[in-house]
Amino acid sequence: MMLLKIEEEVRIYEEQIVKSKMESHPHIRLVLEDRGVKGDFRVRDLRPMGLRINGRIKVNPSLDAVQTRVEVKESGQTIICDPAVAYYSSRLQTERIQNAIEAEELRVKIGSPIAVADPFCGVGPALAHLVNRPNLVGQILASDLNPEAISMLNENLRRWRGCDIEESSQRKLQRNKDVWSGVQDARELAENPELLGRWNMMIINLPHSFAEFLPLLIPLMDATKPFVIRGRLVCRHDEITENHQQLLEQMPNSNAQVVLDPRRDYSPITSLCSVTIRNP
């Protein structure tokens, strides 16, 4: 599958573009126009542009004729995803690899497998980089607001962990041995006493709302041990230092380390920063 963004000035050539792409990449089955994200779940707005059927390329196929559910590989794991119903971005692999590096270092500090929480997990790509490492992860909390994402997440977890994960009819958050998974508003996680003070690592992949959710989720962390919070944050170029201080002030330990690493410009006045918080 290939996603393309088509600028208006070249739209008149889209048929030629699609055929050229598919002829150059014979393994590509489907080409979709990516018209950005939409809705509360930030699902991609996709339009079919080209479909390979029995070796022949059909341009502008009907939506009913295409299957957008695919399997992708990351860190040696196969991830079931469907960009038409659940957010997934392969461009975040660098962040996910860094998560794994931080997790390995944290395990050494703690001296045992770590408990990982991903309250905006989607189909689970961040977890894919962690669960295949020997003795790295013990317990998992994986939640999201999108029921379709949770359905695919549970499929992925069953394969990765080799265990049964039961699903309620509404896919609500529930525990299956060492895995909590399901539909849950991250704002309400701290209302569950079972989840409080339990987690050693948390992933907050919500760039526009990282600072909003951080204080709501800190109570889930096990403050008796070192812990790490990883995520991304969009902020103004001239407010990075201020944001750094604000994040530091929210930590329970004054010796915590906050790293804000600007990765790229998000707009002319804002940066997309990688965030690492280490609580000693």
PLM regions and their residue ranges:
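SAM-dependent transferase fold signal centered on methyltransferase-like domains
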Residues: 1-280
